[in-house]
Amino acid sequence: DHGVMYGVIDFYKAAKAAGIKPILGCEIYVTPGSRFDRDNKKGEARYYHLILLAENNEGYENLTKIVSRGFVDGFYYKPRVDFETLREFSKGIIASSACLAGEVARNLAVNRYEDAKEAALRYRDIFGADNFFLELQDHGLSVQKAVNQQLIQLSRDTGIPLIATNDIHYTQPEDWEAHDLLLCLQTGKKASDEDRMRYEGGQYYLKSEEEMRSLFAAVPEALENTAKIAARCEVEIRFHELKLPAYDVPEGYADAASYLRALSEEGFRARYPEEPAALRARMEEELAVIGRMGYVDYFLIVWDYIHFAKEHGIGVGPGRGSAAGSVVSYCLGITDIDP
């Protein structure tokens, strides 16, 4: 997907069900300036394409952070990220120079070899020598063939390895016409319009190994490197597993559990000045259950935003589910009905 990861989970599940190894990634948009910029220098590209693949679970987490930052901080026509973001979240990620819209290829297409070289070396510096690749594609376009020759030379000059891919937008060769019509629907154009978005050549399908070997017979190492990347990528998404953010505990407390206990004790004395033994025992049992189930951070997070809302005059609900009958919830001020 371009700039988003909406389809990752469905793709992951479908691939696993079919016995196919899922390789998770995103074709992101990289701005040459800051992600906070909302204008461009004259003659400067608004963004470039870059392929990012998750090599492992750390890489997958970093990839989601990169994509999220593109929307939160960098959205301007597209969800863009900058080099600062890439450096911050580069671990566990394998990157490639992408298609003709990538920074390296775009410079090569206009005969700016040194600029392309500088860009390639920058990406290698960000992701590491073993984690950045120059990407060859061949969809029968003359400009692509010319750029490929320069990419091969660039690989020789820099030592950055090559890979060979195909930009896939549909499955079978005969699907090109349906894809073209869908593009017209998406962009509000007629098929007969001259000035419209189109994928020339009809070669954006899932090509076989034989076709790829024929296209890139002159650079077999590019295909070998592509296979090596596929072998390296191992992401295991564990569903139905509790994943909660860690709460930042203030100084003076050993851990989240001790902070939750302190807040609960304070609230207990405020809610029940007589401190009835039966309710104290009930609170102790609830705290023990919360700890065993791994919900300590969750209770602190809920307490934090409920407390913030009440302090700022923001209305909150009365609570629902089992938490509405919890003494701890009542003592924390999450609920206001004495259970």
PLM feature segments, named:
Residues 2-339:
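Phosphodiester-processing cores and adjacent nucleic acid-binding clamps
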